[in-house]
Amino acid sequence: MSFYTSLSGLRAAQTDLGVIAHNIANAETTGFKKSDTQFADLVAGGAASDPRMMKGIGVAVSAIAQNFTLGAVEQTGNVTDLAITGDGFFAVRGGESGQTAFTRNGAFMLDQGGFLHDGAGNRLQMIATDGSGNPGASGATADTRLPLVNAAGADLAGVTIGKDGTISAAYADGAVTNVGRVALASFTSPVGLRPLGNSKWEATGLSGAPQIGFPGAGRNGTLLSGALERSNVDLAEEMIGLISAQRNFQANAKAIDTASQLSQTIINLRT
């Protein structure tokens, strides 16, 4: 039985090493959130077992929990780069798939059609507003699109995004038009989000449905234009965890080796 106990320790340590390696590999990934491996002990016995005689039979990985603490904010100077200074996620919709995902990576750019999108072509979602900045009757989200030419025929000259998410388009004739406000999503339990890769997640039953609102409203943080949120990976902390996981793996391997030697001793006694 000691073989299987130590083998479970090897597998758990190997999983931990993989999670830490993934964190380290993404230390420079914009909007990345690290994960932590959580363990649970395994015990042999049932409800009728004598608690004084129950023994442990190993360990299992109970969860690989995502850590949504904020990463450092880095200034870029690009007005369409956005960082959330608090909770919340950007909502982005696939141009072809139509599927909505959620991200902390605010590296957006303007395409030839006037859409704000990320590097994969997913379009930033906004809520259309009236002249006073109030949401429309439906309050539904839509792709963020800036008219390249205004009603007077003037070309788009620039864009600004306020901390409350207000998107303003400036034109060559000096006119300024408020297009809408950036939509942010919050969740009852962000750790329940399913990672999709590329610093994106999708909602699940564990996370709860997305609650769409404006920056600075409810639990949502405000926006900082011209900045991006870096990965929340602390390399020093991960290196310490890596050493600990490596020693854990080596210790379990040694325990298997010791059990093997004991078994061989017993076999030798019988011969």
Task: State where each predicted segment sits.
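Amphipathic alpha-helical polymerization modules
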Residues: M1-G133, G139-T141, L146-T271
